[in-house]
Regions:
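Bacterial N-terminal signal peptides that target proteins for export
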Residues: 1-8
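Sequence-pattern detector for short linear motifs
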Residues: 8-9, 416
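Subset of outer-membrane beta-barrel
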Residues: 24-431
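Hydrophobic alpha-helical membrane context
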Residues: 17-18, 79
């Protein structure tokens, strides 16, 4: 018997919790001054310690939003709730000076359950991108002539905001071992980038520029998975995903001005740019191999065609983003009630070519390695029946600049995710 009242209460509680997450921003990086900012990790607890893989991954104990076709793996008796947070320690360096910044952020909120036979549904809230920076630099300008004194300029950069997505997705098993799925997301948020220049020469007016955008639109993601038994204990799952590239509905503005004694003397502004922003066409392929439910290995490749998109009405200023990920999981004994044999061990790594260009050149390369484990949480039903878990993972990430003027960034991240496995659909015996 389906507990509709429980489902309704949970869904309402889920949507009531979303507004409290809007203000969370995990960015604190000079690299976010470019374009949409730092693209957020779309993975949940099952993905984070495995290099972010998920396109070919299926799990009935944790939610995998990287491929909506995986929603059909949910247990018919269960409803899953997941929430995750990350603590981050960041180090920035230009070769001469170093800066250390610590912060924390909300990562995700998701709920998954079986809707009908062969069909699973997921509701979720994820960040899409983060903007957060505030720094300045000083430069000495050469004199115009032998009679002039050198002029110094202080350039200040600041920005904040980000984009978020609340989504609903379904997966459907159209044939035995073949599933398809889709996520429909409401993408929303705002961000601004500000830059100013102040000169030591009073004859040069201070300059300030501000870019602002507020985005609100619908986003579509699609996926498919096919599971192929290779032996009695071996299972290969192939996956593919596609995200629709599209124009974004946005309110945007650009303001540039120069001031003298606090009064604007030169100003230029554009209050709305038609079709200013686009999402990229995104293609992903992945595969995982599972042996005896104990060992899982997998790999993903993701390509985002940012080079074909517009940002503030300009095209060709971004690069295609490529991400390659590998990951593995070891599960000592799925049938045991022993606590230590129920711990899952995970590890993974990835390489990414970011979408940002600086002065027409690709700005950086990104590398990451991580590891983690999943611990069962005790309950009155015991380990095997309830299967609520806590996922803990650590990750080291390096953003390595390819051009001068871009900082080297190193991150240490500790992520914690909680998965609550509620038994909603068990028929109770009446004695």
């Amino acid at each position: 018997m389906i507990h509709y009242r429980k489902a309704l209460i949970a869904i309402l509680s889920f949507f009531m919790a979303i507004p409290h997450c809007w203000g969370q921003n995990g960015a604190n990086s000079p690299f976010t001054r470019y374009r949409f900012g730092q693209l957020a990790d779309q993975g949940l607890g099952v993905n984070k310690a495995m290099g972010g893989i998920g396109i070919g991954l299926r799990s009935n104990l944790q939610i995998n939003v990287n491929n909506p076709a995986s929603y059909t793996a949910v247990d018919s008796l269960s409803c899953l709730f997941e929430v995750g947070f990350t603590m981050q320690n960041a180090n920035f360096s230009d070769g001469n000076t170093k800066l250390n910044v610590k912060n924390s952020s909300f990562d995700y909120l998701a709920m998954q359950f079986r809707l009908f036979r062969g069909m699973g549904m997921t509701l979720g809230f994820l960040p899409y991108s983060n903007v957060g920076y505030n720094f300045s630099s000083t430069e000495e300008l050469p004199p115009l002539s032998d009679w002039d004194d050198p002029t110094s300029v202080i350039r200040s950069y600041s920005g904040n905001g980000g984009l978020h997505q609340a989504f609903i997705g379904v997966g459907y098993e159209i044939l035995p071992k073949l599933s398809i799925g889709t996520n429909v997301s409401y993408l929303f948020g705002n961000f601004n980038h500000k830059v100013s220049a102040n000169f030591s020469d009073a004859n040069i007016y201070p300059l300030a520029r501000t870019y602002y955008a507020e985005i609100s639109d619908v986003k579509f993601d699609f996926g498919a998975q096919y599971s192929l038994p290779l032996s009695k204990k071996g299972l290969l799952t192939l996956g593919a995903t596609y995200s629709l590239g599209q124009d974004l509905n946005a309110i945007n503005s650009y303001i540039s001005n120069q001031k003298l004694n606090g009064s604007v003397v030169i100003s230029d502004s554009v209050t709305h740019i038609n079709k200013a922003f686009q999402l990229p066409h995104t293609f992903g392929i992945g595969a995982t191999y599972e042996y005896d439910e104990r060992l899982t290995v997998g790999a993903d490749v993701l390509l985002q065609k940012f080079s074909e998109t517009r940002f503030f009405g300009k095209k060709g200023e971004l690069a295609d983003r490529l991400k390659c990920s590998v990951g593995a999981q070891y599960y000592p004994d799925p049938t045991s009630n022993n606590f230590f044999k129920q711990i899952k061990y995970r590890a993974g790594a990835y390489y990414s070519k970011p979408y940002v260009k600086v002065n027409g050149q690709e700005a950086a390369r990104e590398f990451g390695v991580g590891a983690g484990l999943t611990l069962p949480i005790s309950s009155k039903w015991g380990w095997m029946n309830q299967r609520s878990i806590i996922s803990i993972s650590g990750e080291w990430v390096k953003i390595d600049p390819q051009i001068k003027g871009v900082l080297t960034e190193n991150y240490l991240r500790l992520s914690v995710g909680l998965t609550f496995n509620e038994r909603w659909f068990i028929k109770q015996k009446v004695r």
